[in-house]
Amino acid sequence: MYKLIYSVLIAFFIAMLEGPILIPLLHKFKFGQSIREDGPKTHLKKAGTPTMGGIIFILATFITMAVIVKKPSDEAMIALYAFIGFGIIGAIDDTLKIVRRKNLGLRAYQKMILLLAISGIFAYYSANNPYIGTSIIIPFKRDTWDLGVFYIPFIIVYFAATTNAVNLTDGLDGLATSVTLLVMTFLALVSFAMGHITLAVFCAILAGALLGFLKYNAFPAQIFMGDTGSLALGGAIGAVAMILKLPLLVIIIGGIYVLEALSVIFQVLSFKLTGKRIFKMAPIHHHFELSGWHETRVVSVFCIVTVILCLVGFLSL
């Protein structure tokens, strides 16, 4: 447990030190965020805020892992590879947005192909790893379910859904950072309790790095994580839950991600079928904004909900 604590502290301080170095550099090279023209008008003033800030917690996590974990387990390396691999896709997307000077990076089908390809690699490895296999734990029943030949397609869809859901959540200052900080803290404790010590250290390190990043990402944000950060976080959550055989648990503890994704799906379906929108704007955090909620209130409420969902998730194990 002490190792988890000082892992958090080291990653936190590294991320804190990176901010004053990286933020001016991104400003200098004009790596600014383009804002959706159809988004809330209050967000237009955020145009030009440096993006690709996910580099801060990715580097902090990588450096701390190298310092703390002398002999990383295979499972910790899987999580780290997923974290970095999906982050690279996000970095490509962010770079294209910056070069084009508009909020249009990879096309939807291009991004999905890349996400599915990397998801497929991890799904295949997991299915053929004797320590992971093709079974998953069913929350509340405390039983396992062997998916057999359906495991690989399930994990591929699961990774794609998780990364996209976290990406959709990253729409307000500090929102995705705060929610994922809580989720990773929970996964660190669960990993530790299940005997996956090195994996628990990875989760703790990432939580610490996110806490340090939050100093610069909280309202008013000095930097955005970009797709570099959000896809990396989705990949990390996906990989850790996959290793623990707990992908279904993410639906509970990551209820905010699920809500954000479903709000977009229902909004699109409703408009196509009836010509009417369910929400004032999707994802749903924008609906609350347009209903008069300040960004900080939305973030606070979503964090409280996540804490409650993590407690429910704990009771389900």
Swiss-Prot record:
Pathway where it operates: Cell wall biogenesis; peptidoglycan biosynthesis
Gene Ontology molecular-function annotations: metal ion binding; phospho-N-acetylmuramoyl-pentapeptide-transferase activity; UDP-N-acetylmuramoyl-L-alanyl-D-glutamyl-meso-2,6-diaminopimelyl-D-alanyl-D-alanine:undecaprenyl-phosphate transferase activity
Top-level EC class as recorded in UniProt: transferase
Subcellular locations according to the entry: Cell membrane
Primary site of residence: membrane
An example Gene Ontology CC term for this record: plasma membrane
Catalytic reaction list: UDP-N-acetyl-alpha-D-muramoyl-L-alanyl-gamma-D-glutamyl-meso-2,6-diaminopimeloyl-D-alanyl-D-alanine + di-trans,octa-cis-undecaprenyl phosphate = di-trans,octa-cis-undecaprenyl diphospho-N-acetyl-alpha-D-muramoyl-L-alanyl-D-glutamyl-meso-2,6-diaminopimeloyl-D-alanyl-D-alanine + UMP
Pfam family, one: MraY_sig1
Record's bilayer topology term: Multi-pass membrane protein
Segments crossing the lipid bilayer: 4-24, 49-69, 76-96, 112-132, 147-167, 186-206, 223-243, 246-266, 297-317
Any GO BP: peptidoglycan biosynthetic process
UniProt keywords, alphabetically: Cell cycle, Cell division, Cell membrane, Cell shape, Cell wall biogenesis/degradation, Magnesium, Membrane, Metal-binding, Peptidoglycan synthesis, Transferase, Transmembrane, Transmembrane helix
Role, per record: Catalyzes the initial step of the lipid cycle reactions in the biosynthesis of the cell wall peptidoglycan: transfers peptidoglycan precursor phospho-MurNAc-pentapeptide from UDP-MurNAc-pentapeptide onto the lipid carrier undecaprenyl phosphate, yielding undecaprenyl-pyrophosphoryl-MurNAc-pentapeptide, known as lipid I.
Family under the similarity heading: Belongs to the glycosyltransferase 4 family. MraY subfamily.
Protein name as it appears in the record: Phospho-N-acetylmuramoyl-pentapeptide-transferase
Organism encoding this protein: Clostridium kluyveri (strain ATCC 8527 / DSM 555 / NBRC 12016 / NCIMB 10680 / K1)
